[in-house]
Amino acid sequence: MTDSKSNSNSPSLSYKDAGVDIDAGNALVERIKSVAKRTRRPEVMAGLGGFGALFELPKGYQEPVLVAGTDGVGTKLKLAMQLNKHDTIGIDLVAMCVNDLIVGGAEPLFFLDYYATGKLSVDVAASVVEGIGAGCELSGCSLVGGETAEMPGMYEGEDYDLAGFCVGIVEKSKILDGSKVAAGDVLLGIPSSGPHSNGYSLIRKVLEVSGASLDDKVGDTTLGQALLEPTRIYVKPLLELFKNVQVNALSHITGGGLLENIPRVLPENTRAQIDCASWELPPVFKWLQEQGNINAVEMYRTFNCGVGMIVCVPAAEAANAIAQLKQSGEDAFEIGKIVAAEGAPEVDLLNL
C-alpha cells in the first residue's frame, strides 16, 4: 500500500499553476454577457451561465423543421494572429455557419461558439466574441452560449482555434433541397468580400513562396486587409428574397470553390454552365493566381473567385430576383444557367 499523505515539503498546487486560469475565464464570461444581450431574440428563455441554453420555437410555423450546422474558419486564424487583428474573425465564424443554413431555406435562430487556446488572453478572446456578436446581429440569430477551453500543452501560447454551431428553422414545405432545379434555370451570383474563410492554406503557401509583405498594396487596400476581410453574411437579403421570388436552390461557395459546391445542390441529369467572363476576378484573386502561378481550374475549385453565394431561379424570375436583391443592397448578376445532361451533376466553366 502506498502512502497517500501529501509531501509537506512540496508546494500546494492550484489549477492556475497547471496553466488554467479560472479567474480569467470568469472575467471573459462577464465581458461576453453584454454581447449576448445585444443579440437576444424574444425566444431566448435564459441568459448565459446555465448548463444548457433554452430557446422556444418561434410561433407561426405549421411544420417546423430544425436545421443545424457547424464550421470553423480554418487557417485564416493564422493571419489574424500574425496581424494581431481579432475583431472580425468572429464574423467569419458566424458567416460560415449561417450561410450554410440559409442554403436549406432556414432562418438562423441561435449560435454557440467554442474557443480553445493554450493560454487565455481575455482581451483577445473578448475581441473575437465581439465579432461573433456582430455576426449574430447581421444574421438575426442569438448568441446563447459557448465554451472557452484553456488547454496548456495543446496549443502554443495564446494561439487559439474556433468552432461555431448554429441552429435554424424552416417550414417543411419550404425546404430548399435542389429538387426543383430544372434545365433552363438561371444562376445568379452574389459577390464575396474576398476569399472569405476558405483556401487559406494555399494562400499562406503563396505568401511564403512570393515573399510578399502583408502591407503590400492590392487594389485599393493592403494585402493583409484584403485577406482578413470578413466573410459576407447573406441571410437577411435571401430571407427577403424568399418572400417575393421562387428560389429553386442556393449554393454557398466555400471550400471546393464553384466546381465542388454547385453540384451539391443539383439533381441528377443536370449540370451548371458558368460563364467566367460574366464578372471580373477581384484584385486579391488576381494577385493570388499570379504570385502562386495557379492554373484557372485550380482557382475555381479552391476559391470563390469573387462569388460568395449562387442563387438558382427560373428564367422568368431572374430579372425580378436581381431587382429584389439590389433593393437589399446586393449587386447580384447573372453568371450562368442549368442545362440537361446525363449522369451526376457537374460544372462547366466557360470562357476561362
Curated annotation (Swiss-Prot):
Q: What's the domain of life for this entry?
A: Bacteria
Q: Which GO terms describe its molecular function?
A: ATP binding; phosphoribosylamine-glycine ligase activity; phosphoribosylformylglycinamidine cyclo-ligase activity
Localization (cell): Cytoplasm
Q: List the disulfide bonds.
A: none
At the highest ranks, the source species' classification is: Bacteria, Pseudomonadati, Pseudomonadota, Gammaproteobacteria, Cellvibrionales
Keyword line = ATP-binding, Cytoplasm, Ligase, Nucleotide-binding, Purine biosynthesis
List the protein's name: Phosphoribosylformylglycinamidine cyclo-ligase
- GO biological process, any: 'de novo' IMP biosynthetic process
Q: Which organism is it from?
A: Saccharophagus degradans (strain 2-40 / ATCC 43961 / DSM 17024)
